[in-house]
Amino acid sequence: MHEKSLTELRAALTAKECSAVELAQLYLKRIDAANSLNAFIQVDPDLTLAQAKAADALLHTGHAGPLVGLPIAHKDVFVTKGWRSTAGSKMLSNYESPFDATVVARLQNAGMVCVGKTNMDEFAMGSSNENSYFGPVQNPWDVKAVPGGSSGGSAAAVAARLAPAATGTDTGGSIRQPASFSGITGIKPTYGRVSRYGMIAFASSLDQGGPMAQSAADCATLLNAMAGFDERDSTSLVRDDEDYTRYLGKPWKEESAAKPLAGLRIGLPKEYFGAGLADDVRASVDAALKQYEALGATLVDVSLPKTELSIPVYYVIAPAEASSNLSRFDGVRFGHRAAEYRDLLDMYKKSRAEGFGPEVKRRILVGAYVLSHGYYDAYYLQAQKIRRIIAQDFQEAFKQCDVIMGPVAPSVAWDLGAKGDDPVQMYLADIYTLSVSLAGLPGMSVPCGFGAGANAQRPVGLQIIGNYFNEARMLQVADAFQRATDWHRKAPAGV
């Protein structure tokens, strides 16, 4: 049962092959057995089974929605009533929220059953899930490798079939990169599609929640429940609700059923295929693009000339926003408080020094520096100007194509500990995802192969980038690929 997708599990529930309680018990046992992966920060069987019993009561009425009774894991950046909400940090290691994040509440209202809170890089700052106060997460495909970050716990949980789906957040690639490294599907929607209310903030102009699951079809179903306007989030977009599954299984153009993607133009940015891209990643992406051609799509060369500037721009803007957002954690209102201190100022210093990890401190320092007098204009304002140019580059590219494709990351997952001493090398791994986030565009990762040689068990993801509000079409394009291939069906050995 655990190998089934969300859609298949829903069919099993409808056919009464299992109950929501039995399904929850199955995944709780699997989570316990795979404890060494460290994918979860907190599991509470009593809370989970209470939700499952409520879901079964709904299922018995015969009028339950498409997600009722299905298990889901929540990234521990979403606050959840009744569970601890830690953001992977000592600072919040004992924090319990009095309310649910909008994303959590919407999925719970849709009848989904929470099986636990997943591990993550502290305050979502990281690309490897090694920055968590609760320890690193192992990649289920190769336990010597990182699962990606910051949503590494969610990615590992779905890959190891510890949950059929999970929530994630993406600030600069934190859904797409772990989805790629862990061989699952994940989508970052257009900025503002999914409410940030109750999502512990890292960089408010970049953070965006999204679903992670086995397939594009599963992600589309989840996005139906997650997306939508929320008056409690000032950046939430006022748009009509839409069905993100509406194009699944349909041809790109109605008259082209024989070639389902005939008429689709796929843009290939030359900047995504240059030096620095590993040969095995290039080979898997090229093979996926050939499959798209077989489905009828046309490949078009495009250019995103400011791609290389996305790293310095991101690492000015995101830390600047983080230094402001994280100033609230002072040991007074909430968060870790030092046991011994001389006065109020000393309490602030010691509480923050003890509560934050080294990567978070590094980014707070960078952010405070670029916002300081004399550097604000030189760094922060300059970065915001280039950010606008990056967004304009994408709009020029979309004049020639319908979607843009390329690798998610320059390499497959690296070994645990391999880049911990060199944060710049870690930052460079986000080269293909950062510009999408800076532009506020939707992007997703779809499994498309594996590395070579010693990396033969480490997955590769294909990145699909759409224009604003084009998620339904992106999911259609991803789903067509998954109907023609089985990469998304593959699971780690022993799972």
UniProtKB/Swiss-Prot annotation:
InterPro entries associated with the record: Amidase (IPR000120), Amidase_CS (IPR020556), Amidase_dom (IPR023631), AS_sf (IPR036928), GatA (IPR004412)
Entry coiled-coil feature ranges: none
This enzyme's EC code(s): 6.3.5.7
Active-site residues, as the UniProt record annotates them: 75 (charge relay system), 150 (charge relay system), 174 (acyl-ester intermediate)
GO cellular component terms, semicolon-separated: glutamyl-tRNA(Gln) amidotransferase complex
Catalytic activity: L-glutamyl-tRNA(Gln) + L-glutamine + ATP + H2O = L-glutaminyl-tRNA(Gln) + L-glutamate + ADP + phosphate + H(+)
GO molecular function per UniProt: ATP binding; glutaminyl-tRNA synthase (glutamine-hydrolyzing) activity
BP GO terms, sorted: translation
UniProt xrefs under Pfam families: Amidase
Keywords linked to the UniProt accession: ATP-binding, Ligase, Nucleotide-binding, Protein biosynthesis
Task performed by this protein: Allows the formation of correctly charged Gln-tRNA(Gln) through the transamidation of misacylated Glu-tRNA(Gln) in organisms which lack glutaminyl-tRNA synthetase. The reaction takes place in the presence of glutamine and ATP through an activated gamma-phospho-Glu-tRNA(Gln).
HAMAP family in the record: GatA
Family membership: Belongs to the amidase family. GatA subfamily.
Quaternary structure (record): Heterotrimer of A, B and C subunits.
Protein known as: Glutamyl-tRNA(Gln) amidotransferase subunit A
